[in-house]
């Protein structure tokens, strides 16, 4: 058995070639072989979001704080809040991030296949994100606002 203390691994900033806005990644674990699972606590500041991406063996997100969005390619935008669990199947193109006025934190758990856990794709554009923030999904009480989230 191994115990990893909270904060025992350094936080890293989410790289600009994978995220838009300010994102902090706190690595939690990477299971030793033959296990393939890894996990991190990821915090998105308001308006921050991942780029579109896929996972070869899928991904599970567990929202722990704030309010945010998740969307599969061609699918509806879904609002996510603390306690929500999102299961992304293998190969599903998706993105996730914070709402315009709220940070969002989730635990991200995924498995490695052939040394890969994620394949990063194109950014979610400001126009795509603003359409989400303008309540394109029609869901009530979503924590959305007219705040502009243009990134530098």
Spans of features found by a protein language model:
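A short beta-strand-loop-beta hairpin characteristic of the jelly-roll/cupin
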Residues: 49, 54-82, 92
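Short acidic/glycine-enriched loop/turn segments that link adjacent beta-strands
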Residues: 22, 36, 57, 102-103
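A short, N-terminal "cap"/entry segment at the start of jelly-roll beta-barrel domains
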Residues: 1-37, 117-152
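Ligand-binding loop in jelly-roll beta-barrel domains
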Residues: 33, 69, 76-77, 81-82, ...
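Conserved short histidine dyad/triad with adjacent acidic residue
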Residues: 24-27, 38-55, 90
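Short, solvent-exposed aromatic-acidic interface loops
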Residues: 43, 111-113, 125-128
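Short, well-ordered turn and helix-capping elements at secondary-structure junctions
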Residues: 7, 27-32, 46-48, 74, ...
């Amino acid at each position: 058995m191994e115990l990893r203390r909270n904060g025992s691994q350094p936080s890293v900033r989410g790289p600009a070639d994978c995220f838009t806005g300010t994102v902090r990644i706190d690595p939690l674990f990477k299971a030793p072989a033959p296990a393939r699972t890894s996990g991190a606590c990821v915090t998105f500041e308001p308006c921050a979001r991942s780029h579109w991406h896929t996972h070869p063996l899928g991904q599970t997100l567990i929202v722990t704080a704030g309010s945010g969005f998740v969307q599969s390619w061609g699918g509806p935008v879904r609002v996510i809040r603390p306690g929500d669990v999102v299961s992304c199947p293998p190969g599903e193109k998706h993105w996730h991030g914070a709402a315009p006025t709220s940070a969002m934190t989730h635990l991200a758990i995924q498995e490695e296949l052939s040394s890969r856990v994620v394949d990063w794709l194109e950014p979610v554009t400001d126009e795509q994100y603003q359409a989400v923030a303008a309540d394109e999904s029609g869901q009530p009480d979503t924590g959305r606002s007219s705040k502009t989230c243009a990134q530098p």
